[in-house]
Amino acid sequence: GGNVAENSGGVHCLKYGLTIHNLLKVRGVTINGEIVEFGSLGLDAPGYDLLPLVTGSEGMLAVVTEVTVKLTPRPQLARCVLAAFDDVVKAGDAVARIIAAGIIPAGLEMMDQPATAAVEEFVHAGYPLEAQAILLCESDGTPEEVAEEVGRVRALLEQSGATEIRVSRDEAERLRFWAGRKAAFPAAGRISPDYYCMDGTIPRKRLGEMLQAIQAMETKYAMRCINVFHAGDGNLHPLIL
């Protein structure tokens, strides 16, 4: 119900969409106790399409009691590429290059140095602490599709000036790469329990420029901030500590 109320996404929403893209039907209860249903199992159901209205309504329209979802087959293989950069602008450029090349990764996430430092103290994911920014780029599909896409991504990362590139060798290493990213918010909470999480979207080609602007504001206003976000769709999450 919470996912429906917020139209939640996540690290794999770049390829697989938000909650609304994976819903068929929602049942809920309105404030006056009326049981209502939105959506249908059929694609050509009559009437207004109100499912997108209730999805993301943050509980204002109904309390969700039942959800019918689409199921997507699990891919045969997934590999995660970890790339380190000595400059946030280069990392932002790499994101723009990947998307401009027509590649839609299963996930494309970015973390700056303060974020990776906080995460390493918390979960020990093996991130390169000397990097000013890291990218996590996941490819999934058949073994042949994954190999081809990883090769293209690696070439683009090298063109963008990556100082280190690692490809997960097995499922355990892939999960370890992602464990750090998924623990970023709890890791920030260990440093500052009352941090503020911002949420905004900007053009991917301006990511590096935006991160530099955030760094300038940190200096100007004597504040601390870590950045961990969905780079593939330009969705920033600066955490003000």
Model-derived segments and spans:
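FAD-binding subdomain of flavoenzyme oxidoreductases
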Residues: 1-109
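C-terminal substrate-recognition/cap domain of FAD-linked oxidoreductases
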Residues: 69-73, 79-241
